[in-house]
């Protein structure tokens, strides 16, 4: 308040424009972009010959600029999928879904360049979404819903209405596979490949071990799951895994890393683990939610299923 009063009382003082900058910074800390915009515009109009006028103009541009970012988790084929959107100064976007023509091991996926989708993907479909205007010039989060395509690697791109230079995109892995692991007394690792929604084991799945190479991944060894979707892995003289599960029809599971220390317990401490599964990823009002689970206990030298263990599941 004192700074504002001083600016109004002594408008002819040469240092007043500096006060506008200081006040704009203070309003930034308060996250009051509406008043901040008013102040910098007042300074620009009142002191057009100020040598630091571009600083005020840059603040005005920063406030008015649009911003956009996407975030999406691994999707399940054919299911409704949530897309997290963070944006500012936009009223609508078009989500474009591209099918990527690269294997999951490709270095290009990890180091995407400008116009990635035009070089390595083909447009499958697009859908427009309206966004609530951000009249306070602040970034907001919202969640949109799309239907996931069939298993594969995709690129999801958001193109703003009437705005250029602020589009954003992210990889979207669509797979029905998920892995659960547990350590065994002999130092190996047991993996179970299951359906990510139902939790049912996948006996047709394989797990491949990779090493990093040139920004991508080079396959080293592949293991076949048994009828229970289970297989055992050795660490191959390494303390770290890069691996993924795949089938003939589903080879889009992201390549994951797992350090040996993530599950190796130096002390004999028990750890209870619970994995929950539902029959679908998104529900409509009134639908029944079917839940199944796998509960087991980890110890340094043993792993055992917790039979008849009771849990309370809350929605």
Which role does the model predict for each range below?
Residues 1-315:
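N-terminal, cleavable Sec-dependent signal peptides of secreted/periplasmic/extracellular proteins
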């Amino acid at each position: 308040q004192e700074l504002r009063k001083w600016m109004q009382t002594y408008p002819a003082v040469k240092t007043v424009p500096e006060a506008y900058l200081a006040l704009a910074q203070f309003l930034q800390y308060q996250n009051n972009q509406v008043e901040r915009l008013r102040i910098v515009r007042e300074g620009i109009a009142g002191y057009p010959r100020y040598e630091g006028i571009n600083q005020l103009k840059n603040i005005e541009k920063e406030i008015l600029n649009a911003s956009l970012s996407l975030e999406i988790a691994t999707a399940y084929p054919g299911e409704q999928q949530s897309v997290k959107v963070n944006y500012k100064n936009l009223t609508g976007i078009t989500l474009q879904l591209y099918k990527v023509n690269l294997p999951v091991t490709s270095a290009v996926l990890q180091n995407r360049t400008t116009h990635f989708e035009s070089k390595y993907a083909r447009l499958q479909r697009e859908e427009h979404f309206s966004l609530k205007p951000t009249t306070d010039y602040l970034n907001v989060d919202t969640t949109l819903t799309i239907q996931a395509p069939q298993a594969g690697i995709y690129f999801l791109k958001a193109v703003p209405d009437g705005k250029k230079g602020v589009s954003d995109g992210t990889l979207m892995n669509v797979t029905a596979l998920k892995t659960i692991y547990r350590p065994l007394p002999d130092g190996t690792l047991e993996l179970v490949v299951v359906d990510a929604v139902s939790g049912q084991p996948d006996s047709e799945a394989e797990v491949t071990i990779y090493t990093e190479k040139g920004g991508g991944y080079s396959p080293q060894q592949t293991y076949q799951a048994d009828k229970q979707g289970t297989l055992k892995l050795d660490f191959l003289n390494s303390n770290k895994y890069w691996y993924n599960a795949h089938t003939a029809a589903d080879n889009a599971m992201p390549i994951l890393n797992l350090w040996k220390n993530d599950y190796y317990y130096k002390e004999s401490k028990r750890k209870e683990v619970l994995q929950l599964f539902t029959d679908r990823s998104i529900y409509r009002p009134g639908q029944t939610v079917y839940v199944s689970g796998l509960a087991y206990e980890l110890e340094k030298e043993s792993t055992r299923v917790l039979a008849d263990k009771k849990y309370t599941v809350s929605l």
